């Protein structure tokens, strides 16, 4: 059967337009035709470049590192990375969990399709239904499950696998290209489901199909889990086997929800019965894209929808009493195999040993109250559980299992027998399982990874998962590590690198240095000695002043003895002309004359012609050298 599933996976991945789930590199863009045409006209690019060995080795190392890179969810689960707060408004690309790994929704849908196809042979998974048909199915499952005892965690009566009915042409097994490719490639486009979900007053048209049974169970489990974390005590009261207890439980959940809605503005208020029931039915089919974080656009629309109802708390409690039956407008449901109960589907979703919880009287997913399913969209289901070791668990697994501490805090619930004691082992087992799975399952588009793999994969295998990764991230800060690794003075003294010295020894060393310096300074010659050696001149201010005065007198005497101009003329040393000759000259351009710049092509041709004529007729040339005469071109 595994081989068949593998074959289906490969076939569907090959046919789907989205990026392949197992690919290690993101899909690269095709080069346009222009670049190849351009190379034809560039002959210097024709020769094939030889790839260097270094380049090949580096690329091989990089591919190996990328193949062993762990997903962000894996690192959060191991406690290496802290989980960043979800940015509600900024999320443009919806990611979905598949067994602890983040992949785009387009990939997940193809993967879920394959699982549905392969498991249909076993009759274990029900096929996809539009949301209105699921509501009609809810009605049937309600009546079936009320007759059973609440304490029995057994399967509902499983029908034999029936042939898949002919769907409409839109609902092909692979979702339409717009749905998958749009979700995976264009992050800014919202899938059509989400627009239908918030349509204010009308019943929306049937949306294109999403991955069916596993996603609905995840949402149902997520809704029950989110109710636990919001702290509404009344919703968790154990339900009795009688049919009348169901509406009562739903009223309590509704009233507790109305209380929390009144206190916090961010919570949704449901206004009228068709809208609430329609929202709940859409919630069950809209896949995990709503669980992982809605775009800001849909949040705003839902918030406007809340504000249309004044005094919603009083109206809600009255209207929710009549809200339990689903809307009567529904086409006849196609024959379906009943879905697996919550435990079995959780096991198929996360193939790890887990502690399983079923809310109330272990009802299958389709039998859950629509008002409970409505809260699957609540952002409060983004809670993360912590195991005994303090590691955060990814959201998908958090919907399927819980820890001993939380079981003690919450109201009494039914556990699958024999698994309570294994909760601590199941966490460590799931960690090891995830560590093994990430190499095969991981894709390169799994959101931001906050570190880069600097070391070889061997180091990853050496240490245990958490410590090796933590040390790898710490190793990035090399300076801090080097400073932290510097040995202390005591260690250096212990290793005999530094000599151990007491305070007295240090004082003695200082005194020795001081005496050396004093001795050297005392050996310097004094100023008197230098003056005696005539190195330093004696300074006497009176003598200096006298020398200056003498210099001035000598200079002034020289200046006073200078002859006047008349004396110089008399001695005929200076001769002045009586007049100055002045000649007029025209102003002209002193740059060199360039006649060739003024010649036109016709002038040049005439000059060449004249030269040729002169050389051929008039110029005297020796007969033997006439052949060497150079003529200008005409």
Swiss-Prot record:
Per UniProt, the ranges with Polar residues bias are: 13-26
| Modified sites of kind Phosphothreonine | 25
Q: What keywords sit in the KW lines?
A: Actin-binding, Lipoprotein, Membrane, Myristate, Phosphoprotein, Protein phosphatase inhibitor, Repeat
Recorded GO MF terms:
actin binding; protein phosphatase inhibitor activity
Q: Which residues carry this modification: Phosphoserine?
A: 16, 423, 522, 560
- Cite the record's Low complexity compositional bias ranges: 231-247, 276-290
Q: Which GO terms describe its cellular component?
A: plasma membrane; platelet alpha granule membrane
Q: Which Gene Ontology biological process is one annotated for this entry?
A: actin cytoskeleton organization
Spell out the Gene3D superfamilies in the cross-references: 6.10.140.1750, 6.10.140.2130
Q: Where is this chain compositionally biased, Basic and acidic residues type?
A: 108-120, 137-147, 291-304, 488-508
Residue span of region Disordered: 1-32, 84-344, 412-471, 485-508
Q: Where is the composition biased (Acidic residues)?
A: 452-464
User: RPEL repeats at which positions?
Assistant: 60-85, 477-502, 515-540, 553-578
Q: Where is the composition biased (Pro residues)?
A: 153-162, 324-341
Annotated family: Belongs to the phosphatase and actin regulator family.
Q: Quaternary arrangement and interactors, per the entry?
A: Binds PPP1CA and actin.
- The molecule here is called Phosphatase and actin regulator 2
Q: Which organism is it from?
A: Homo sapiens (Human)
Q: Which gene encodes it?
A: PHACTR2
């Amino acid at each position: 059967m595994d081989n068949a599933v593998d074959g289906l996976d490969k076939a569907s991945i090959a046919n789907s337009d989205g990026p392949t789930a197992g690919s290690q590199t993101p899909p690269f863009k095709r080069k346009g035709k222009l670049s190849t045409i351009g190379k034809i006209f560039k002959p210097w690019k024709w020769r094939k470049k030889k790839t260097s060995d270094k380049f090949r080795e580096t690329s091989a190392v990089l591919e190996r590192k990328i193949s062993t890179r762990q997903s962000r969810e894996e690192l959060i689960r191991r406690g290496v990375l802290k989980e960043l707060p979800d940015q509600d408004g900024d999320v443009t690309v919806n990611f979905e969990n598949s067994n602890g790994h983040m992949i785009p929704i387009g990939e997940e849908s193809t993967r879920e399709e394959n699982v549905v196809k392969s498991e249909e042979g076993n009759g274990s998974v029900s096929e996809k239904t539009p949301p209105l048909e699921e509501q009609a199915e809810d009605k049937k499952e309600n009546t079936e499950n009320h007759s059973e005892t609440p304490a029995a965690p057994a399967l509902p009566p499983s029908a034999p696998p029936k042939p898949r009915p002919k769907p409409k042409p839109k609902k092909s097994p692979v979702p339409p290209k717009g749905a998958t490719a749009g979700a995976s490639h264009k992050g800014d486009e919202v899938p059509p489901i989400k627009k239908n979900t918030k349509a204010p007053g009308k019943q929306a048209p049937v949306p294109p199909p999403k991955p069916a049974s596993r996603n609905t169970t995840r949402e149902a489990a997520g809704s029950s889990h989110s109710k636990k974390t919001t702290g509404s005590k009344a919703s968790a009261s154990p339900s009795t086997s009688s049919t009348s207890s169901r509406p009562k439980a739903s009223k309590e959940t509704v009233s507790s929800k109305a209380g929390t809605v009144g206190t916090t503005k961010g919570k949704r208020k449901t206004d009228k019965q068709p809208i609430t029931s329609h929202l709940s039915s859409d919630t069950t089919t809209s896949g995990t894209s709503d669980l992982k974080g809605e775009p800001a656009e849909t949040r705003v629309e839902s918030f406007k929808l809340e504000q249309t109802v004044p005094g919603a708390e009083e109206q809600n409690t009255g209207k929710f009493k009549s809200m339990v039956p689903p809307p009567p407008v529904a086409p006849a449901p196609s024959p379906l195999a009943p879905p697996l109960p919550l435990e079995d589907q959780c096991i198929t979703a996360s193939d790890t040993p887990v502690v399983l919880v079923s809310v109330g009287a272990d009802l299958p997913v389709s039998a859950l109250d629509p008002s409970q399913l409505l809260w699957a969209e609540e952002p409060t289901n983004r809670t993360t559980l912590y195991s005994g070791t303090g590691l955060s668990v990814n959201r998908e697994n958090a919907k399927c299992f819980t820890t001993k501490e939380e079981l003690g805090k919450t109201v009494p619930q039914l556990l699958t027998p024999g698994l309570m004691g294994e909760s601590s082992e199941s966490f460590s087992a799931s960690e090891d399982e995830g560590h093994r799975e990430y190499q095969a399952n991981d894709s390169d588009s799994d959101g931001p990874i906050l570190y880069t793999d600097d070391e070889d994969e061997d180091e990853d295998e050496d240490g245990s998962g958490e410590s090796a990764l933590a040390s790898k991230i710490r190793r990035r800060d090399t300076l801090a590590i080097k400073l932290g690794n510097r040995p202390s003075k005591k260690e250096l003294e212990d290793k005999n690198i530094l000599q151990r010295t007491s305070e007295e020894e240090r004082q003695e060393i200082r005194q020795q240095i001081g005496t050396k310096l004093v001795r050297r300074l005392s050996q310097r010659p004094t100023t008197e000695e230098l003056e005696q050696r005539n190195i330093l001149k004696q300074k006497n201010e009176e003598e200096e002043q006298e020398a200056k005065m003498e210099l001035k007198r000598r200079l002034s005497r020289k200046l006073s003895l200078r002859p006047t101009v008349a004396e110089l003329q008399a001695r005929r040393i200076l001769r002045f002309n009586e007049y100055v000759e002045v000649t007029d000259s025209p102003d002209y351009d002193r740059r060199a004359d360039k006649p060739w710049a003024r010649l036109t092509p016709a002038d040049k041709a005439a000059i060449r012609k004249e030269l040729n004529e002169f050389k051929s007729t008039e110029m005297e040339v020796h007969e033997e050298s006439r052949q060497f005469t150079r003529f200008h071109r005409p």
